Amino acid sequence: MRTGHERVGVAEFVPEVNFIRTIDIHHNYAACEEHFGKKVFVHRKGATSAKLDEIGIIPGSMGAASYIVRGLGNPDSFMSCSHGAGRRMSRIAASTTLTVEECDRAMDGIVCERWHKYKGYGKAKGKLDLSEAPQAYKDIEDVIASERDLVEPLVRLVPLASLKG
C-alpha cells in the first residue's frame, strides 16, 4: 500500500503535476471472490484483478510503455489479467548475457540511475545488475494485444524517468 510519499517526491521535482487519480494494485495476493456461482479463493501471482470496468495498470519494463486499462470482467480468466510484461529472461541470465552498452541504448532518453553491481551470488556476482533492463522483459505491445479479451487499453504511458526504490 502506498502512503502518499511518492506524490510528495514527484511534486518536489514537477510542482505543476496534478494527481487526478491514483491506481494502486497488487500483483501477488489471494482474495475471496465469487466465480461460477461459488465463493473461491483466487490467488493472483503476477496477475491482477480485471473485473468489469475496474481500472488497472499493466506496466512495461523500465524502458517501455505502460498501459492504463479497464477490466472486461472475463469469467474465463477469473476476471484477471497480467500485471506487467513478464520476464523474457531470468535476472541472472540478463546480468550475465546483456551488455551495459545495449542496456544504455534501450534506456536512451529516459532519466534513470544507471546500473549497480549485482548483490546476488553465483555467476552474476560482481557484475553489473542488468536484471531490470528492458531486454529482460517481453514486448508490452504483444502482451496488451494478447489480453484484448481481458482488458481495454485506455491510456498508453511512455516513460520519461525510471525510479527504483
Model-based region annotation:
Residues M1-G165:
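Domain-length cofactor-binding catalytic modules of enzymes
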